[in-house]
Amino acid sequence: MFITDDDYSVLVREEIKDILLENYSETKLRAAEQMAIDQVKNYLSGKYDTGEIFSRTGDARNSHIVMITLDCALYHLYTPIPRKMPETRAQRYQDAIDWLKLVAKGEGTADLPKIKNESGETLSGIRFTSKYTAENNRW
């Protein structure tokens, strides 16, 4: 498992975790974690080897990805009870999504393993950009 119960102790106190899980089962907690992992994978999959990133365990994991995944999982746990959601939780989730969007666009960097081809060479995509906005010149 990519996320462990010990990871939660860094971001939330144990009593807050207990409040969140009041009406939840272990299955719902794991489902929220899987949703968060899939969400992060969807943003990173174009440039980074998400299979390798999320197969790591313990200290081999990237701590920033662990933090972002936890922020997303905790946000998903709070979603059914929005009145209990602290402002910091919503802000941390938005910060995580903003960073993931930057990395997905190629405007941010991450110390993560890049996608490689069968011969082990790092793949890099070609991206065309322009400082001019797109225009529709149909008459």
Located regions from the model:
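Conserved short "hinge" loops at termini or chain/domain junctions
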Residues: 1-62, 121-139
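Short loop/turn elements at secondary-structure junctions
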Residues: 75-139
